[in-house]
């Protein structure tokens, strides 16, 4: 008999909100008796952009900006219907992207 697994990937620009959301998901799953693996921190994606400061000349004077995308992975092993209902009812903060695979 194959065991069922729910894989949850979280993405956010702010790591504090991301960790708070991961903690809420883990607590909700453990309250219903499911086994939880994680949250596992995945590599942070860093996008860097260089912009010329001057509107006309001076290519040498540039400003650098970066966007960091933090990611976490949570596996819920053998979820019951109660566990799935509890996860669906969670109210997570805005700014957190959630991807769920069964």
Swiss-Prot record:
Report whether Lyase shows up as a keyword of the record: no
GO MF annotation terms: structural constituent of ribosome; tRNA binding
Q: Which Pfam families does the record cross-reference, listed alphabetically?
A: Ribosomal_S10
Point out the gene that encodes the protein.
rpsJ
Q: Which SMART domains match?
A: Ribosomal_S10
This molecule's function is given as:
Involved in the binding of tRNA to the ribosomes.
A Gene Ontology biological process term: translation
Query: Which HAMAP family does the record associate with it?
Result: Ribosomal_uS10
Which Gene3D superfamilies does the UniProt record give?
Answer: Ribosomal protein S10 domain
Species of origin reads Roseiflexus sp. (strain RS-1)
Q: How does it assemble?
A: Part of the 30S ribosomal subunit.
Cellular component aspect of the GO annotation? ribonucleoprotein complex; ribosome
Full protein name: Small ribosomal subunit protein uS10
Q: Which family does it belong to?
A: Belongs to the universal ribosomal protein uS10 family.
State the UniProt keywords alphabetically: Ribonucleoprotein, Ribosomal protein
């Amino acid at each position: 008999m194959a065991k069922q697994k729910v894989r949850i990937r979280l993405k956010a620009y702010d790591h504090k909100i991301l960790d708070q959301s991961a903690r809420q998901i883990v607590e909700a799953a453990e309250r219903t008796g499911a086994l939880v693996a994680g949250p596992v921190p995945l590599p942070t994606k860093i996008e860097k952009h260089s912009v010329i400061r001057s509107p006309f000349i001076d290519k040498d004077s540039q400003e650098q900006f970066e966007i960091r995308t933090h990611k976490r992975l949570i596996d819920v092993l053998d979820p019951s219907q109660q566990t799935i209902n509890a996860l669906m009812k969670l109210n997570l903060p805005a700014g957190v992207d959630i991807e769920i695979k069964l």
